[in-house]
Every structure is written in C-alpha cells, then in structure tokens.
From Swiss-Prot:
Organism of provenance: Methanococcus vannielii (strain ATCC 35089 / DSM 1224 / JCM 13029 / OCM 148 / SB)
Record keywords, A-Z: Cytoplasm, Endonuclease, Hydrolase, Nuclease, tRNA processing
Protein name listed in UniProt: Ribonuclease P protein component 1
Record keyword DNA-binding present: no
Lineage: Archaea, Methanobacteriati, Methanobacteriota, Methanomada group, Methanococci
EC number: 3.1.26.5
Family per similarity comment: Belongs to the eukaryotic/archaeal RNase P protein component 1 family.
A single cellular component GO annotation: cytoplasm
Nuclease listed as a keyword: yes
Catalytic activity from the UniProt record: Endonucleolytic cleavage of RNA, removing 5'-extranucleotides from tRNA precursor
Amino acid sequence: MKFSQNILRHELVGLNLEIVNSTDKRLISTKGRVINETRNMLVIEKNNGKEITVPKEISIFRFEFSDLDTPKKVDIDGRLLIGRPEDRLKRKIKQLYPY
C-alpha cells in the first residue's frame, strides 16, 4: 500500500500538527505535538508547553510525517479520525482518492 493510503491508520501520538481550519476560529493556526488521543479529542502540547484539547470533528489538521529523510505534510479532516485509536486501525476505509 502507498503511504497516502496508510495515513488514517497511522499512530498520531508524537506527531507535529497544525490546525488549518476549524469551526472554532481560535484554534486555527495552533501548532504543537499530539500527546494523547481519545475517541473524539486530540490533546496537543503547544510550543509554549500549554496543553489544549481539540475536538476532532470540528477541525482539519495538517500532520507532519517523517518518511525516511523527507518530511511530508498532509491535511486530514478530523471527522475521518473519529474513533478510538485502536479501533481506527481495524476499520475499513473507503477509498476517497484515486491514488
């Protein structure tokens, strides 16, 4: 499988992210590292050390993946991430993009 098809099954804890769009305008442009994930929320540690909890459903996230030596940035709609992390790994994902 290609990298693009595995993104939704990837472990998110430890990844750097930026919120690129959200219905809560205060969250847009927030950057940090994912430190915990629940069914509906991501806990993000911002660069200043503060922790915030962000609902997955209302945001679009830009994750930074380190694939070998080339970092990749990928935008993911938070609605696709809803669910417990361990269940998301098992879930069948409809092909959304013709990669």
